[in-house]
């Protein structure tokens, strides 16, 4: 679309060459991107292309794209220029260093290098329209179309206006979650708040492995006291944690609940027991509940209540809005604590304009869509149950039950997690998370698979079976289409 697109008739004759200045995003489904490969017959060159090229260069000079000549020829009654539609072949147009970087990640022949280049991007996969991203974790059923339409309707003004500062946005976040404004901090994603919080902590930190490593990576390795459950299913109880950490000198205990990547959910009653236990021992408790809205009984599982925060002022609750609310591109997260000194310090530590106007507007209007969000989460849970049944039929996978929007899967011999991840990407354009190198999985092979909508989930199941020659129990539509169809052109 950057240089030239065309429109076709039912016989694949090119009707128009559309230059960039005439490109309309409203008509993008009608366009085909040219791959800049042309075959001209001698007769076409003699009767059409060379005469028009000569006249065009005399009139407008030589500093023009050759396709401008084809654009003029296409206006004739019988231009005799046909297109050949590509059938899924990989191609990429390279005009600058960004294009070169993307093309390198697409066309490298080495499977491991292909995977490494894709993983190292940490997102931005809209640049790869055929990729199905099962690596990063969002809600496939929210936001709904009406909310997205409201964002789009206000997009131009929001882009041109400054966002509010921390005070106003903390008020919005407080309204969003129904807690006091002085207890809550809003961040440019939870990652910004995690960084600020970890720099504030004193003493060693107890960490339950495997975990979301953004937390322990923010402290020195010798300041981490690791807990490894004896359960091969990576489950544990509040009693297990209290017994283990009772004899340890820690200033902070981290609980990611549901666990990432395990998906294990410690019941709220056990979490409240941990709140009391840490309070009596002067231990800061951090609970990351970014995925709690995907847990069964979700409205009652959160700790984001004024009463809970006030009873346990040593408690800090972190929540990523990106995950369960399906808006990772907006970069929103919150931290809540009745420790007013901590909350005030974090608000000063981050930038006053740490979220943009579009993210602020989303927070402003969310209340109108709260019931739609609850329905989306309930719909998600049903699809998660169905998806688990399908994944469980894959011969080389052991799927762990999950209360989050992903499954942790053990990869059984002779398959390896790394090779499976590479095969899915190279052969099926599916990206999953290779967890084989994560701490806590030593000696075992694991991947993490996001739960997406039914069409994508079934595509992944089919791809898994294709790598073993086994048969899936159900079928679904084939690979998704690129935003622009592709074609090469020829003239007779």
Per-range role (PLM):
Residues 198-218:
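Conserved PLP-anchoring active-site segment centered on the Schiff-base-forming lysine
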Residues 143, 426-427, 438-492:
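PLP-dependent enzyme catalytic core of the Aspartate aminotransferase-like
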Residues 232-298:
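Active-site phosphate-binding strand-loop segment of PLP-dependent enzymes
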Residues 380-381, 394-428, 451:
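Conserved PLP-binding catalytic core of the aspartate aminotransferase-like
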Residues 162-163, 174-196:
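Short loop-beta-helix segment that forms the pyridoxal 5′-phosphate
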Residues 2-60:
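Conserved core of the sugar-phosphate nucleotidyltransferase
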Residues 32, 165, 314-400:
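PLP-dependent aminotransferase class I/II
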Residues 106-161, 248-249:
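N-terminal "arm"/small-domain region of PLP-dependent enzymes with the aminotransferase-like
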């Amino acid at each position: 679309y950057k240089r030239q697109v065309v429109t076709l008739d039912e016989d694949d004759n090119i009707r128009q060459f559309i230059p960039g200045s005439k490109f309309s995003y409203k008509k993008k489904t009608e366009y085909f991107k040219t791959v800049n490969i042309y075959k001209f017959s001698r007769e076409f060159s003699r009767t059409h292309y060379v005469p028009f090229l000569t006249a065009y260069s005399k009139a407008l000079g030589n500093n023009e794209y050759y396709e401008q000549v084809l654009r003029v020829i296409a206006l004739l009654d019988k231009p005799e220029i046909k297109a050949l539609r590509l059938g899924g072949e990989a191609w990429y147009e390279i005009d600058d260093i960004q294009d070169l970087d993307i093309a390198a990640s697409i066309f490298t022949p080495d499977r491991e290098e292909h995977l490494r280049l894709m993983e190292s991007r940490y997102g931005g996969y809209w640049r790869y329209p055929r990729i199905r991203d099962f690596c990063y974790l969002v809600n496939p059923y929210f936001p709904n179309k009406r909310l997205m339409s409201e964002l789009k309707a206000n997009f131009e003004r929001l882009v041109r206006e400054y966002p509010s500062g921390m005070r106003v946005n903390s008020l919005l976040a407080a309204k969003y979650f129904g807690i006091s404004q002085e207890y809550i901090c809003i961040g440019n994603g939870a990652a910004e708040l995690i960084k600020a919080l970890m720099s504030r902590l004193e003493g060693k930190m107890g960490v339950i492995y495997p975990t979301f490593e953004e937390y322990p990576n923010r402290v020195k390795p010798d300041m981490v006291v690791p807990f490894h459950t004896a359960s091969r299913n990576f489950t544990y109880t509040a009693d297990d944690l209290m017994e283990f950490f009772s004899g340890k000198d820690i200033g902070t205990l981290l609980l990611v609940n549901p666990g990432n990547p395990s998906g294990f959910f410690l019941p709220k009653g056990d979490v409240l027991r941990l709140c009391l236990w840490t309070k009596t021992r002067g231990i800061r408790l951090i609970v990351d509940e970014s995925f709690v809205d995907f847990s069964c009984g979700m409205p009652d599982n959160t700790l984001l209540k004024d009463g809970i925060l006030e009873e346990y002022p040593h408690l800090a609750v972190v929540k990523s809005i990106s995950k369960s609310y399906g808006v990772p591109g907006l970069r929103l997260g919150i931290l809540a604590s009745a420790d007013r000194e901590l909350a005030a310090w974090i608000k000063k530590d981050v930038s006053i304009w740490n979220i943009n106007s579009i993210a602020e507007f989303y927070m402003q209007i969310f209340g109108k869509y709260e019931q739609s969000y609850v329905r989306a989460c309930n719909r998600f849970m049903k699809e998660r149950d169905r998806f688990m049944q399908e994944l469980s039929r894959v011969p080389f996978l052991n799927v762990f039950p999950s209360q989050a929007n992903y499954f942790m899967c053990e990869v059984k011999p002779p398959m390896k997690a790394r090779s499976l991840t590479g095969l899915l990407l190279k052969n099926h354009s599916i990206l999953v998370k290779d967890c084989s190198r994560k701490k806590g999985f030593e000696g075992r092979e694991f991947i993490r698979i996001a739960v997406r909508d039914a069409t994508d989930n079934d595509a992944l199941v089919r791809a898994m079976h294709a790598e073993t020659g086994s048969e899936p129990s159900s079928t679904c539509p084939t690979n998704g289409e690129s935003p622009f169809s592709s074609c090469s052109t020829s003239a007779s």
